[in-house]
């Protein structure tokens, strides 16, 4: 429920992409938000308003339902006072060009003109219309005025042509809306670099040594950082399929590749002190020799001894000067887990360690996690959905490192 008590006003115009708006409402409500919908007359030609009312659990505002009865407060002025944000999705080229010119000849456009909150526009139009110089000029004008105009995507359009103009997927619009609603001054314009997933160390060209780390915790943490406004780079081997598209993703399979990409990512610095989250499960040992091609079992015989050598300690070898460094440690021995994490905190000169004790409930690949956050002189416990506890952990860091 990351959007608990947030009020989202969704304005829907007449586009074939309207079906995506229904999924978008579902995502917002699942995240705990309150959603109200404004429909243009064109939108109602595609989908009956009752469908939006059933999913949003709120009465639709349109030309026929607008009321100036003060007991209802359901008009284009009052509804903008209720909203925390206004999202127009889909937004046709006609609507975009009218907004740019300040035209308010229907209820939806009047609402836009009356709104003093952040406005996000998700365009949807034929390639020729979205790339028309008039539309391009309108988009640029709206951006200069402070509107957030999202990009479109290239895919098969309603006319069966493949081209630019399709509205972003609902999950991408959801991510962008979450960022606008959740970003904080502490995290905004702050660098955050993360590693994630289990490394894959090649034996030959078809076999490798790895572990069960799914990469989900790193991706959840990267997403939470993005929502809070950070400039995020995720260096990961797996589990990043649903992260926001604006996150800088650097796919890295081997520990050496991960090390090199982390070094490069940490070179980019802002005025605020950066954060490094070492979430990846890096192989402690790697094959001493990497074989070309595929080793044949006929030549290997009944037994096969594979020689391993100790791997580089990425966290110990990265330059962590002027960087908040957070280590992640997975343990199975409950008795020794905390002392092992405390040793990691001290020996690697870290600012914090997130301890994850693995058991039947808290296992690799699950969507929930139980973490003990260890600082130099205190500790905190977190349990729940990985995205939710990521936001809680980051909120704790903001409180603990508030002056830096």
Features from the language model and the residues they span:
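A cross-family phosphate/adenosyl-ligand binding-site feature
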Residues: 1-120, 126-404
């Amino acid at each position: 429920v990351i959007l608990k008590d947030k009020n989202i006003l969704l304005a829907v115009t007449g586009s074939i992409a309207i079906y995506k708006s229904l999924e978008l409402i579902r995502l917002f409500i699942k995240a705990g938000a309150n959603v109200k919908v404004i429909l243009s007359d064109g939108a109602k030609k595609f989908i009956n308003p009752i469908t939006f009312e059933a999913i949003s659990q709120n009465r639709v505002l349109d030309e026929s339902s607008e009321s100036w009865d003060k007991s209802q407060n359901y008009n284009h002025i009052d509804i903008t006072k209720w909203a925390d944000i206004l999202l127009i999705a889909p937004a046709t080229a006609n609507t975009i060009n009218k907004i740019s010119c300040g035209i308010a000849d229907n209820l939806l456009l009047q609402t836009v003109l009356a709104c003093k909150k952040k406005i996000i526009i998700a365009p949807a139009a034929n390639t020729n219309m979205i790339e028309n110089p008039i539309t391009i000029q309108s988009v640029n004008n709206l951006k200069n005025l402070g509107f957030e105009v999202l990009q479109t995507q290239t895919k098969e359009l309603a006319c069966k042509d493949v081209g630019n103009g399709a509205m972003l997927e609902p999950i991408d619009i959801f991510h962008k809306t979450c960022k606008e609603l959740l970003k904080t001054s502490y995290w905004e314009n702050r660098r955050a670099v993360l590693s994630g997933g289990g490394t894959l160390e090649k034996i030959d060209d078809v076999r490798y040594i790895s572990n069960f780390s799914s990469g989900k915790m790193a991706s959840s943490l990267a997403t939470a950082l993005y929502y809070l406004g950070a400039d995020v780079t995720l260096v990961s081997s797996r589990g990043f399929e649903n992260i926001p598209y604006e996150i800088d993703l650097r796919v890295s399979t081997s520990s050496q590749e991960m090390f090199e990409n982390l070094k490069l990512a940490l070179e980019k610095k802002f005025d605020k002190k950066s954060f490094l989250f070492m979430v990846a499960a890096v192989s402690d040992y790697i094959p001493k020799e990497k074989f070309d091609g595929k080793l044949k079992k006929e030549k290997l015989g009944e037994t096969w001894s594979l020689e391993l050598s100790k791997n580089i300690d990425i966290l110990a070898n990265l330059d962590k000067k002027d960087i908040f460094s957070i280590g992640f440690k997975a343990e199975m021995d409950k008795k020794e887990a905390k002392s092992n994490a405390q040793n990691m905190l001290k020996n690697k000169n870290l600012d914090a360690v997130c301890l994850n004790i693995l058991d039947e409930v808290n296992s690799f690949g699950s969507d929930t996690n139980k973490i003990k956050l260890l600082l130099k002189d205190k500790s905190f416990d977190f349990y729940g959905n990985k995205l939710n506890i990521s936001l809680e952990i980051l909120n704790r860091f903001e409180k603990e490192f508030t002056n830096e």
